[in-house]
Amino acid sequence: GHIENTNEEGKAVFDLASLEKLGMVSFQTASPWYNGRTTFTGIPLQKLMDYVGAKGSVVKVTALNDYTTIIPLSDFKKYNVILAVKINEKYIRVRDKGPLFIVYPYDSMPELNNQVFYARSAWQVSRMNIE
C-alpha cells in the first residue's frame, strides 16, 4: 500500500514478535462476540500506521477467509482501535478469531455500538493495504 517504511519490496511484513515490540495496550469492553466484558491486548493501530508511515485515507483489511472491510484511517486515532493479539491474556488462536483481531473499545462511546463498527472489526486479519 501507500507506506514510507518497508521491510520487503513495497510492503511491511510483521510477525507476532515484531508487532509486540511496537508496544501493547489492553482494554476491557463488551462486544457482540463474547459474553460480558472481555480484555483485549494488542498494538494501537495508530502506532502501527505511524511506524509504517501510512499515507492514505483508508485501510483495506483482508482476513484469512478473504473477508474484506474498509476502515477510515481516522478511526484509529479517534477511537484508539487496536490490532488485538490476546483475549483475556491468551494469544488468540485462528479458530478463536486470531491471530489478529481489529477491536474498537465498543462500550467507551455509544456511537461504537452499531453494525458499522462491528463490520470494521475484522478477525483473522492477514493483510492491511493503505489506500
Task: Please give the residue ranges for each predicted region.
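N-terminal intrinsically disordered, low-complexity segments enriched in P/E/S/T
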Residues: 1-131
